[in-house]
Amino acid sequence: MPNLLEKTRKITSILQHSVDSLETELPYNTMASRLADIIDCNACIINGGGTLLGYAMKYKTNTDRVEEFFEAKQFPDTYVKAASRVYDTEANLSVENELTIFPVESKDTYPGGLTTIAPIYGGGMRLGSLIIWRNDNEFSDDDLILVEISSTVVGIQLLNLQTENLEDTIRKQTAVNMAINTLSYSEMKAVAAILGELDGNEGRLTASVIADRIGITRSVIVNALRKLESAGIIESRSLGMKGTYLKVINEGIFAKLKEF
């Protein structure tokens, strides 16, 4: 059986595995699964708003009603508010406690059910909660040490990812601003008309048709597209007689055009 040191190493090794995006569905499922295996429990990770980021069920404990929370990837507001008031790890909470993960209707089925909640912090901010639970068997001191380490590891992962996402957003906004600043009034008018032709973020357009409709030359449209493409705002591909295929890869351009 792995000792505390071996389990700790397994948890800290999670930092070597990156989470690509918080936008993906349940980005922390793999992490929750690894934590559940190491600590031998069910586990879930939620953010500050109660959105489910990942979970792992080693043991059946929930009713259909609670399973719906996991399927919807959102915990009830009342539970989220109660969890947000946990500032230090609360261990071995009984099924009678308001923070129990066990539903009211299953208290008789799992009278020995125990829940442990650990707040997740990063950069001095509350980022979410790590919740683990068992049908019975208290979480030992060794288990709770692993929980503290786990919440720290998850906090580092979340903070790093949020920082990366923020940096990416800033880069995209900067690219849009720089591209917009190179456009003349006529080119801005052309860009607004072009993007208005798209079906969502991509589509086919004919430059000459747009030019005639808004009263500018085709060369203005061509120049505007070239500037946007060189700035990494769009991708384009000639379709010959059918026109040009266009795809927006930096959606910040849409918000910027609303200011035009």
Swiss-Prot record:
UniProt keyword list: Cytoplasm, DNA-binding, Repressor, Transcription, Transcription regulation
Transmembrane segments: none
Location relative to the cell: Cytoplasm
GO cellular component terms given for this protein: cytoplasm
Gene Ontology terms, MF aspect: DNA binding; DNA-binding transcription factor activity; GTP binding
Entry keyword annotation includes Chloroplast: no
Location of region: GAF domain: 1-159
An example Gene Ontology biological process: negative regulation of DNA-templated transcription
Residue ranges of the annotated DNA-binding region, renumbered to this chain: 207-226
UniProt family annotation: Belongs to the CodY family.
HAMAP family: HTH_type_CodY (MF_00621)
Its job: DNA-binding global transcriptional regulator which is involved in the adaptive response to starvation and acts by directly or indirectly controlling the expression of numerous genes in response to nutrient availability. During rapid exponential growth, CodY is highly active and represses genes whose products allow adaptation to nutrient depletion.
NCBIfam families: codY_Gpos, PRK04158.1
Protein name: Global transcriptional regulator CodY
Organism: Streptococcus pyogenes serotype M3 (strain SSI-1)
